[in-house]
Amino acid sequence: MVAPYEIDVEDVEFACPDGVPLLARLYRPRGPGPFPGVVEVHGGAWTMNDRITNHDIHVPLAKSGVVVMSIDFRMPPVAMYPASSVDINFGVRWFKANAERLSVAVDKIGIV
């Protein structure tokens, strides 16, 4: 059995639509990589929760060698459709654009 990775956790701004900073929490295994990566979009019927809601899922994934980016996105009633979808698209694009810096294998990126 492989020992779990030590991880680093940090918040980053990935977009700023209409002057509203959108944050993502990155969970990164320590090591040379590249690692597979996943963008995690929290549940909540598009109206509640945030990037830290599923922390109990993010940590084990990162400790197993997956870079996790859990994102915030605008939600009603503050921002109506399609704002949430647009923000999620920004998050995925940011993750892919920064894959090398984050030690993510660009051909092994998923979304959950």
Residue ranges and their predicted role:
Residues 1-33:
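N-terminal cap/lid segment of alpha/beta-hydrolase-fold proteins
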Residues 24, 34-44:
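Short beta-strand element of the alpha/beta-hydrolase
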Residues 33, 96-112:
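Gly/Ser-rich "nucleophile elbow"/oxyanion-hole loop immediately N-terminal to the catalytic nucleophile
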Residues 40-43, 70, 94:
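Structural cue for short, hydrophobic secondary-structure segments
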Residues 45, 73-77:
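Alpha/beta-hydrolase active-site loop signature
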Residues 48-52, 78-79:
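Short N-terminal helix/helix-N-cap motif within the alpha/beta-hydrolase-1
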Residues 50-70:
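Short amphipathic alpha-helix adjacent to the substrate-entry channel of hydrolases
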Residues 79-101:
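Alpha/beta-hydrolase active-site loop
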